[in-house]
Amino acid sequence: MATINQLVRKPRKRKVAKSDVPALQACPQRRGVCTRVYTTTPKKPNSALRKVCRVRLTNGYEVSSYIGGEGHNLQEHSVVLIRGGRVKDLPGVRYHTVRGTLDTQGVQNRKQGRSKYGAKRPKS
């Protein structure tokens, strides 16, 4: 514990909060172009083929972004919108592609949780 005299001489330093999503530069989303679309395997104990794309953003950053939902239409040169949000079992993937915007189609035949996957309300 510092004495009052020590604190008068040299005040306490503020902790600087580090951003979880630096490539967004304090924006809610960013637009970018897919440079590579591929699948990758998660870390232990999970097992799957996770769909991921490498995206070159409008601000010059190049990041990996997860493509959520069943099936997608993305390929190289597709224009996508990305948001923050990491994938816990994929190291280095700290962004999600937003489904149903720009070149990314929404998930087909999605009945529940539609807003997260850009799916329209089905005709009853």
From Swiss-Prot:
Subunit structure, interactors included: Part of the 30S ribosomal subunit. Contacts proteins S8 and S17. May interact with IF1 in the 30S initiation complex.
Keyword Ion transport: no
Chain intervals with Basic residues compositional bias: 111-124
Stretches the record annotates as Disordered: 1-22, 101-124
Highest taxon, organism lineage: Bacteria
Organism the protein comes from: Marinobacter nauticus (strain ATCC 700491 / DSM 11845 / VT8) (Marinobacter aquaeolei)
Disulfide bonds listed in the record: none
PANTHER family recorded: 30S RIBOSOMAL PROTEIN S12 FAMILY MEMBER
Gene Ontology terms, MF aspect: rRNA binding; structural constituent of ribosome; tRNA binding
Gene Ontology biological process terms, A to Z: translation
Similarity section: Belongs to the universal ribosomal protein uS12 family.
Functional summary from the UniProt entry: With S4 and S5 plays an important role in translational accuracy.
UniProt entry tagged with the keyword tRNA-binding: yes
Name the UniProt record assigns to this protein: Small ribosomal subunit protein uS12
Cellular component terms per the entry's GO annotation: small ribosomal subunit
Keywords of the record: Methylation, Ribonucleoprotein, Ribosomal protein, RNA-binding, rRNA-binding, tRNA-binding
CDD domains: Ribosomal_S12
Record PTM 3-methylthioaspartic acid, positions in chain: D89
